C-alpha cells in the first residue's frame, strides 16, 4: 500500500531550482514526521509528487500515516493507492473489475485516469474501455460523467496501475522551513492560535512568545495550545517557547501611566520586548493575532502608534478577518476548546481607553517607566525547546501522582484525540474508562463525579501531565496520571 503526495499548486508554479528546493524540503519533513510513527516508513521524491510506502507487514499504519500527511504544510492532497502491474488496457480492466464490482452495483459511476510515461494508449482510451466494461458486466445503473455516485480513480505510471482507495485533503501552503522563522505572540485565546497556525501553514518555523500577566494556570494553558499546534502541524522542526514574566510591567503601568493610554502602552511594551527576544533568536518578524477594530487598541491609529515602538516587522494575518471566521478556523485546527477554557487576566483595563492615541503623548507617558525595565524583563525570560515541555512539567507536578496500578473508585480517562483512540483503543478489564479528548477535558471535568479519582491516560504521557497540572491549578485534586 502506498500514498501519492501531490504538491500544492503554488509549489508547482515556482522556478525549477525553487521547486526542487521546496520538494526536497517537503520530502524531508514528511520523513521526519512519519519516522516518529514507524521507523520503516519509506519516502521517495519525484519531480511532481512524493511517494510514501506503508510497510507490507504493517497495513494498520495506513490510517496513522494518512492523518499525519493531512497535517503537513505544502501538500495539496494525498491519495492512498493499491499497486498492480499490467500489460495491456484489457489487463487494467480485468484488475479493476473485481475491486469495483460491488461498489458500483446499483449506482452511477465514472472512470477517471491520470497517466505518466510512454504508452500506446492515452488516458481517455483507458477511461472508455474500463468504463464500458464495468457498465456492461456489473449491476451499475450506468455511467454519469457529472456528479457520479462512485468515481473510479486510476493512476498509471510505466507498467504500474494504482487504484485510488482514498483521497485525503492536505493543508496547502508551503513546506515547513522554506520561509524564514517568525516569533508568534501567543495568549492561548482564539486569535493567537489561528495566527500562529497560518504562519506554520505558510512554511515559517513558528516560535512562541508568551507574556505572563500573572498565574501559573495561564502559562500551563498556553503551553498546551503551543504544544498542540507544534505537535499537530509543525512537528518536523524544532521550535522554542519563550515565557516572559510581565507582571513588573503591568505593575508600573497601573501605577504610573495615564488611564486612557494603558492599553496602547502595554502593547508597545510587549512589542519592544518581543523584538529584543526575536533579535537574540535571529528572527526578523513578530506575528500577532490582532484584528482591525476588535478592541480599542486595534484601531488603525492605535496600531500605527504601536508599530512605531520598534523597527521589527510586525505581521497580522487576521487583520481583516471577522471574529466568527476566526472562531470557525480555531475549531477546525483543534484549539477552540483550549481557548474557551483559557483563564483571562485583565489587569490592565482602561476606564476610557483611547481609540486615537497620539504618538507624542504615548511616548511622554513611557518616560515614566524605570530605565532598565525592558532589560530586566528580557533577562528573566525563560526559553525552552517546545519538546522539553513534558520534562518541565515533570519537575512541577509535585501534587500529582503517577500510577501504574488502578484502585477501586478510580476511573481512567483516555484523553487522546478521537482518531488516535480509535486506532489503539484502551481496554482494561474491570475498569471504567471514559473517553474525553484532551481539548475538551477542561470544560467537561467539572461535570464528573467529584467523589471519584480520575487517572489521565495518553500514549506518551506528555498531554496527560499537562492536563493534570492544569486541573490542579484550577483546584481539582482528584486527578492522577496513569502510565501503565
UniProtKB/Swiss-Prot annotation:
Descriptive protein name: tRNA sulfurtransferase
NCBIfam families found in the cross-reference section: ThiI_C_thiazole, tRNA uracil 4-sulfurtransferase ThiI
Disulphides: 346-458
Protein family according to the UniProt entry: Belongs to the ThiI family.
General function of this protein: Catalyzes the ATP-dependent transfer of a sulfur to tRNA to produce 4-thiouridine in position 8 of tRNAs, which functions as a near-UV photosensor. Also catalyzes the transfer of sulfur to the sulfur carrier protein ThiS, forming ThiS-thiocarboxylate. This is a step in the synthesis of thiazole, in the thiamine biosynthesis pathway. The sulfur is donated as persulfide by IscS.
One Gene Ontology molecular-function label: tRNA-uracil-4 sulfurtransferase activity
Principal localisation: cytoplasm
GO cellular component terms, A-Z: cytosol
Record has Nucleotide-binding as a keyword: yes
Active site: 458
List of residues binding ATP: 185-186, 267, 289, 298
E.C. number: 2.8.1.4
Catalysis performed (reactions): [ThiI sulfur-carrier protein]-S-sulfanyl-L-cysteine + a uridine in tRNA + 2 reduced [2Fe-2S]-[ferredoxin] + ATP + H(+) = [ThiI sulfur-carrier protein]-L-cysteine + a 4-thiouridine in tRNA + 2 oxidized [2Fe-2S]-[ferredoxin] + AMP + diphosphate; [ThiS sulfur-carrier protein]-C-terminal Gly-Gly-AMP + S-sulfanyl-L-cysteinyl-[cysteine desulfurase] + AH2 = [ThiS sulfur-carrier protein]-C-terminal-Gly-aminoethanethioate + L-cysteinyl-[cysteine desulfurase] + A + AMP + 2 H(+)
Entry keyword annotation includes Cytoplasm: yes
UniProtKB keywords: ATP-binding, Cytoplasm, Disulfide bond, Nucleotide-binding, Redox-active center, RNA-binding, Thiamine biosynthesis, Transferase, tRNA-binding
GN (gene name): thiI
Enzyme class: transferase
Originating species: Shewanella sp. (strain MR-4)
PROSITE patterns (UniProt xref): RHODANESE_3 (PS50206), THUMP (PS51165)
Pathway annotation from the record: Cofactor biosynthesis; thiamine diphosphate biosynthesis
Domain THUMP: 63-167
BP GO annotations: thiamine biosynthetic process; thiamine diphosphate biosynthetic process; thiazole biosynthetic process; tRNA 4-thiouridine biosynthesis
Subcellular location: Cytoplasm
Gene3D superfamilies referenced in this protein's UniProt entry, alphabetically: 3.30.2130.30, HUPs, Rhodanese-like domain
Rhodanese domain boundaries: 406-484
Amino acid at each position: 500500500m502506498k500514498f501519492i503526495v501531490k504538491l500544492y499548486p503554488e509549489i508547482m508554479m515556482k522556478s525549477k531550482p525553487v521547486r526542487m528546493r521546496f520538494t526536497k524540503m517537503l520530502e524531508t519533513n514528511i520523513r521526519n514526521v512519519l519516522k516518529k510513527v514507524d521507523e520503516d516508513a519509506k519516502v521517495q521524491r519525484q519531480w511532481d509528487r512524493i511517494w510514501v510506502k506503508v510497510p507490507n507487514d504493517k497495513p494498520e499504519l495506513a490510517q496513522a500515516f494518512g492523518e499525519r500527511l493531512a497535517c503537513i504544510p505544502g501538500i495539496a492532497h494525498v491519495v492512498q493507492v493499491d499497486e498492480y502491474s499490467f500489460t495491456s488496457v484489457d489487463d487494467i480492466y480485468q484488475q479493476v473489475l473485481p475491486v469495483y464490482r460491488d461498489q458500483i452495483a446499483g449506482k452511477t459511476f465514472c472512470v477517471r485516469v491520470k497517466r505518466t510515461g510512454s504508452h500506446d494508449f492515452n488516458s481517455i482510451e483507458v477511461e472508455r474501455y474500463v468504463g464500458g466494461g464495468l457498465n456492461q458486466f456489473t449491476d451499475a445503473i450506468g455511467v454519469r460523467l457529472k456528479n457520479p455516485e462512485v468515481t473510479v480513480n486510476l493512476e498509471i505510471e510505466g507498467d504500474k496501475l494504482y487504484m485510488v482507495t482514498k483521497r485525503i485533503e492536505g493543508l496547502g501552503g508551503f513546506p515547513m522551513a522554506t520561509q524564514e522563522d517568525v516569533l508568534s505572540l501567543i495568549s492561548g485565546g482564539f486569535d493567537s492560535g489561528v495566527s500562529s497556525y497560518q504562519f506554520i501553514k505558510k512554511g515559517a518555523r513558528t516560535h512562541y512568545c508568551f507574556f505572563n500577566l500573572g498565574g501559573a494556570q495561564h502559562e500551563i494553558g498556553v503551553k498546551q495550545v503551543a504544544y498542540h499546534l507544534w505537535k499537530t502541524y509543525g512537528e518536523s522542526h524544532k521550535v522554542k517557547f519563550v515565557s516572559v514574566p510581565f507582571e513588573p510591567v503591568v505593575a508600573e503601568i497601573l501605577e504610573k501611566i495615564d488611564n486612557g493610554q494603558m492599553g496602547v502602552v502595554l502593547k508597545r511594551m510587549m512589542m519592544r520586548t518581543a523584538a529584543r527576544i526575536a533579535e537574540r533568536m535571529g528572527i526578523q518578524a513578530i506575528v500577532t493575532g490582532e484584528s482591525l477594530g476588535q478592541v480599542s487598541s486595534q484601531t488603525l491609529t492605535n496600531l500605527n502608534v504601536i508599530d512605531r515602538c520598534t523597527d521589527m516587522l510586525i505581521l497580522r494575518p487576521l487583520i481583516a478577518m471577522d471574529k466568527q471566521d476566526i472562531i470557525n478556523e480555531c475549531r477546525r485546527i483543534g484549539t477552540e476548546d483550549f481557548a474557551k477554557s483559557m483563564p483571562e487576566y485583565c489587569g490592565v483595563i482602561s476606564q476610557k481607553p483611547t481609540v486615537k492615541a497620539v504618538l507624542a503623548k504615548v511616548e511622554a507617558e513611557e518616560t515614566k517607566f524605570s530605565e532598565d525595565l525592558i532589560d530586566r524583563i528580557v533577562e528573566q525570560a525563560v526559553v525552552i525547546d517546545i519538546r522539553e515541555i513534558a520534562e518541565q512539567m515533570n519537575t512541577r507536578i509535585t501534587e500529582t501522582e503517577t500510577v501504574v496500578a488502578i484502585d477501586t473508585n478510580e476511573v481512567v480517562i483516555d484523553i487522546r484525540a478521537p482518531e488516535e483512540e480509535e486506532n489503539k483503543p484502551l481496554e482494561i478489564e474491570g475498569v471504567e474508562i471514559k473517553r474525553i479528548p484532551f481539548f475538551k477535558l477542561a470544560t467537561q471535568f467539572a461535570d464528573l463525579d467529584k467523589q471519584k479519582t480520575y487517572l489521565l491516560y495518553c500514549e506518551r504521557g506528555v498531554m496527560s501531565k499537562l492536563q493534570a497540572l492544569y486541573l490542579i491549578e484550577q483546584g481539582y485534586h482528584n486527578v492522577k496520571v496513569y502510565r501503565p
